[in-house]
Amino acid sequence: QVTSPSHPDPTAWYNNSNPIFNWELASDITGVNILADHSPSTNPGTVSDGRFSTYNYKEVKDGSWYFHLRLRNAGGWGDITHFSFNIDTIPPTDLKLILMDRLDLTAPEVAFTVTATDTASGVDRYEISIDNSSSTVWFDNVDHRFVTSRLKPGPHTLLVKVYDKAGNNLAGSMDFSIVSLPAPKIIDYPREIATDKTITLRGEALAETLVILRFKHP
């Protein structure tokens, strides 16, 4: 049985290009033959590479690989063991942050299109934060649409870090602003106020907004 302390899960991706493989070596083993390639069922042959129970490849190129092992004893060469491993050392590319059309620049929630590319292991997740807030994990949906939480008016910065399935990452940012609602204006008001009379005010404010009045006695 072949194991790998550096690439233990045959279905996972790793950003380590120096895989290590171990196997048990019984006392009667007289020869070991190993090979790594891109085929799942390669026969490494019948020429012994020596007698050893571990091997460390160096600077293996990115991609999906298979490690092949064959052992020999006095009875000849045994069956071939195959072990798959995946390497991806290149970060994602083409991180694009696009501010979606905004009909209302004062709206506290802002939508972005967030996309990235990874040709080897594939994009896994995004870590997104606004300004200096804690980041949240976001998984891309079908339309690549990310919507912020409700934000206060003013300038903001969208910070995005995209990870591939091997843990490599690429960061990007985009500045945007939320416009403040214009303050309501009082156009006319009575110069004298009596406690037993209705107060009538005239003013201007955006449609469908709630205006709260506070009266303060000097």
Please tell me what each predicted stretch does.
Residues 1-217:
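Low-complexity, disordered linker/stalk regions enriched in Pro/Thr/Ser/Gly
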